Amino acid sequence: MPEDIFQGLEMFGLSSYEIKVYKTLLIKGPQNSTDIVKNSGIPQPRVYDIFNNLVRKGLIESSQIGKKKIFRAVPVKNALSHHITEMNAFLDELDKVVREETKNSSVKTPYIWLIENSEKILERMKELITEAKYEVILSLRKENLEELLKILNNEARRGITIALVTFPDTGEDLIARLNPNIVIKKRDGIASEVLIADRSKGILNAENSSKTNYGLYFEEDEIIHILNYYFYHTIWWPSFYITDFTNSNSRKISTAWLTCEAVSSYKTKGMRVTAKLRLKMGDEEKDMTGEISQISVVPGLRHTFYLKSRSGRISVGGKTARFENARLLYGVLNAK
């Protein structure tokens, strides 16, 4: 059997463990959790996280037979064809928008800076973290996490939402030193280090073939949008939670997909979520409060949440907000 063909599922956001489980169920048919662990070789403590992720992604289904829960794979074409259709629709829409927006606009030089050497990259990361007013979204390897640990803990105590993705080089002892209010996920494989603060400034930390570190610093809105998209699909989505949003009942936010993740965490625990938001509706900015009644997520296309206020129910999205009534600028979530 050509093993490499299954690794191609990584492009759909599956981790290596998720691929092993999905492959096992595709090849061997429906099984209970004990048999899946035995046949796939995944660690027992991770099994239910992986099942939940695969169910959420529409790749497996479960049913109760007696006292046992049985899992089965959704056929490949059924499970993945809608992702391909949605991505093609998104690309068509994006291409159309780019052509329309650039038709009559003057060319601007993007605000992009090259940062050379690890020390300067860390200094700029520290600046962005301490200057944040609402949220910091980032992925870090062990070495830089150790350097930024104190600052991240301080900002979490200050009420800034910190959403962190770690990699396999980070052990439980280091994770245990993080403030419990920090949202932590772990990715099975190493990826780029990214930092986005308040959805307005960002850093991409890279390493070239000669192992000389360099970083790219952005303040250009369109490039931040692309970096955010890359972070969600390549780093955040394939990762699993260690600590979710529910350790704190109040979260500052400025990113639509992070808001949807937080609301999902709260509602999974049976909590009611209210919000005080600054929104952009057309050319006007408005303050609105209400209850977030629902979220709607189509990976690669939209992250929408619905705010029920005295004036009615409105849909809220991210930067483009092409399917929603309003665009999120910033705000605070409260859950109870």
Give each language-model segment a name.
Residues 65, 74, 141, 167, ...:
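Surface loops and adjacent helix of pleckstrin homology
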Residues 77, 81-86, 90-164, 327-330, ...:
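PLD-like (HKD) phosphodiesterase/transphosphatidyltransferase domain
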Residues 85, 108-109, 145-148, 154-158, ...:
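Contiguous mid-protein beta-loop-alpha structural module that forms a pocket-lining wall or clamp
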Residues 253-336:
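N-terminal accessory interaction module
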Residues 127-133, 177-178, 196-197, 266-272:
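Flexible, charged surface loops at secondary-structure boundaries
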